[in-house]
Amino acid sequence: LIHSNKYYPFDRSRCEKDLQLTIFDPECFKLAADEILTSHPNIQPILYTRAVAPIMSGNRVTGVYVENREGRGAILAKRVIDATGMSFLLRAAGAECVSTCANAPHRQGPILVFFRAGGISEVTPTYRPNVTDVPYGAINLFPTMRDHEYRIEMTRALGDGSSVEDMTRASIECRRQIPEIIEYLRKNWYGCENIYLIDSGNEALPMSLYKLVGRRPVCVNDMLNGVVPEDTIALCGYGIDVHSAEKGGQNYLHYLELGQ
């Protein structure tokens, strides 16, 4: 990809500068993840199991209650990591968390369903903002590892990501939008004359998430000035993607200068 100018990293239609994503095949990822987990002597994978509540000892989380096909059980641990994506265990344990859409009406934020399409030209423009004819408000295509195949982020609904009712409604609405988006691209977007739907995501993705209130918040000035805290454990090569609670895309783009 890096050495070919017909692919995505050199697509000048993108809103991001010099954007390069780590493209991977989801089926290869599943196999690689299984191999890593099963080859480690101290890891015991347990699939088809959901954590339903934390086990508390005072104000410490010492494990989780789980439910699966065998019923309800408990797993004790020295360390518990909340990887639910919604801070579910953190909130259930009483930790202070705030919604990323706390200031939006009814705590509503964008919810979307990704889908994958084939039959698309390799030289099609992948981004255009302010497209009012589609729910997302923009054309937004991402290439996969296969020629003529793209992952598409163009559905949009609003809701509270912690509400089962909102997530159900948004999932159904976003899936309903997909055939209309496919047809719009076929008729109106260069390179999509032969587009067809391959599949869609099993779950909707809410942008209205909950985050833990830490010892020190990351402020706007920190982000704009590229402040790196002393206790940093990792650096990310991608931007902070801010989605409007009312429409698609970012509200604000700020680029660091070379060397920052």
Say what each PLM segment does.
Residues 55-62:
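A short, glycine/Asx- and small/polar-enriched loop/turn
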Residues 47-48, 60, 67-79, 83-260:
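Flavin (FAD/FMN)-binding glycine-rich loop and adjacent Rossmann-like elements that form
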Residues 1-49, 53, 109:
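Conserved N-terminal/central alpha/beta ligand/cofactor-binding core
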Residues 18, 28-30, 36-39, 65, ...:
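Sparse, context-dependent recognition of short Cys/His-centered cofactor- or disulfide-binding micro-motifs
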